[in-house]
Structures are given as structure tokens and as C-alpha cells.
From Swiss-Prot:
Gene: atpH
Topology term for the membrane: Peripheral membrane protein
PANTHER family: ATP SYNTHASE DELTA CHAIN
Location(s), subcellular: Cell membrane
Gene Ontology cellular-component terms listed: plasma membrane; proton-transporting ATP synthase complex
Keywords annotated in UniProt: ATP synthesis, Cell membrane, CF(1), Hydrogen ion transport, Ion transport, Membrane, Transport
Family in the record: Belongs to the ATPase delta chain family.
NCBIfam families in UniProt: ATP_synt_delta
Subunit: F-type ATPases have 2 components, F(1) - the catalytic core - and F(0) - the membrane proton channel. F(1) has five subunits: alpha(3), beta(3), gamma(1), delta(1), epsilon(1). F(0) has three main subunits: a(1), b(2) and c(10-14). The alpha and beta chains form an alternating ring which encloses part of the gamma chain. F(1) is attached to F(0) by a central stalk formed by the gamma and epsilon chains, while a peripheral stalk is formed by the delta and b chains.
MF terms (GO), sorted A to Z: proton-transporting ATP synthase activity, rotational mechanism
Any Pfam family: OSCP
Protein name: ATP synthase subunit delta
Function: F(1)F(0) ATP synthase produces ATP from ADP in the presence of a proton or sodium gradient. F-type ATPases consist of two structural domains, F(1) containing the extramembraneous catalytic core and F(0) containing the membrane proton channel, linked together by a central stalk and a peripheral stalk. During catalysis, ATP synthesis in the catalytic domain of F(1) is coupled via a rotary mechanism of the central stalk subunits to proton translocation.
């Protein structure tokens, strides 16, 4: 029975996290996997090639060897492990699960800040720091989505929690009170 993408990501992501923890390299692995994820997303053909059943293991290994230079021995071992089990088609999902485990272990939140206009990095960081402090997180990594329909303010979606401080939401509340 084939594993689902989610189950594959969970199993391999957990195994990689445990391996990194046992070797005392969780931060290094996090950093390198994050870098690798960005590279793979910028060049998705990399995963497609290493997942291609037409290429034999030796060809895939030589391609991987060329790419893994500059990464730690631990990450190289992980990449070779994934290659040997033919799991490169799940690479981004596996990395995402590792990041999820790392963030949970280190009390780091992730979320989205929806704003009407794009904030500068400093504004976004101040918002993240404020939220992290209020909710007991060590850090918060926020992505920004611009949504002109919220008119102004910000809608924060963090770890399943939504805080709607948008002008649109406030106007809807006023409208609801007036129509009662």
C-alpha cells in the first residue's frame, strides 16, 4: 500500500528531525533545508529529474552529488537517504514537515498578515514581534498578502487563530449593529 503525500512527509520529516536532534544539528538542518526548499521552488525541474524513473540510480546519484556540494555532511546523508528510497518527489512536503517540527520544538509560529498595502520589512517584523510576545512565542515568521478589499488595518492568521483588525471588518460590525 502506497503512503499518502502527507504520511510520507510526516514519516520522513520526523525521521530527519530525530536524526538532526540526535546529532545536535537541528538548527543547521533547519537552515539548510530552508535554503534547499527555496532553491527547489525556484528550480522545480531539480525534483522532477531526481524523481524521473527513466534515470537509473547512478545517474541520479551523480546529479545529486553535483548539487549537494556546500551542504553539511548531515544534509548530504539525508538527501542520499531520500534518493535511495525514491522520495524526491515528496522533498518539499518533507522539508515543510521538518520545519513544522522545528518550529514547534522552538516555539516559533508562522502566519500570514493580510494588509491593504504592502508594509515594509520593519513594519512586518514589528507586527510579528508584538504578536509573538503577546502569545508566548519565541519568534513569529509572517508572510504578507496584500488584499485591497480589507481597506486598511491588518488581518493576522497565525497557527489557526485569526485576528481581524481590518477596517472592512469594523465597518461590517457597525453595519450589523445599525441593522438590528
Amino acid at each position: 500500500m502506497a503512503l499518502s503525500r502527507e504520511e510520507t512527509a510526516r514519516r520522513y520529516g520526523t525521521a530527519i528531525f530525530d536524526f538532526a536532534k540526535d546529532s545536535g544539528k537541528t538548527e543547521l538542518m533547519y537552515s539548510e533545508l530552508t535554503e534547499l526548499k527555496k532553491a527547489v521552488q525556484a528550480e522545480p525541474r531539480f525534483v522532477q529529474v531526481l524523481s524521473n524513473p527513466v534515470l537509473d540510480a547512478k545517474q541520479k546519484k551523480s546529479l545529486l552529488t553535483a548539487v549537494e556540494q556546500g551542504f553539511s555532511a548531515e544534509l548530504q546523508e539525508v538527501l542520499n537517504f531520500l534518493l535511495s528510497y525514491d522520495r524526491f518527489d515528496n522533498l518539499v512536503d518533507i522539508i515543510d514537515y521538518y520545519i513544522h517540527l522545528y518550529n514547534a520544538a522552538n516555539h516559533i509560529g508562522t502566519g500570514v498578515a493580510k494588509t491593504a498595502l504592502k508594509p515594509d520589512e520593519d513594519q512586518l517584523q514589528r507586527l510579528a514581534d508584538s504578536y509573538a510576545k503577546k502569545y508566548g512565542l519565541q519568534a513569529l515568521h509572517l508572510e504578507n498578502e496584500v488584499d485591497p478589499e480589507i481597506i486598511g488595518g491588518v488581518v493576522l492568521e497565525v497557527e489557526g487563530r485569526v485576528i481581524d483588525g481590518s477596517v472592512k471588518h469594523r465597518l461590517e460590525k457597525i453595519r450589523a449593529m445599525l441593522t438590528k
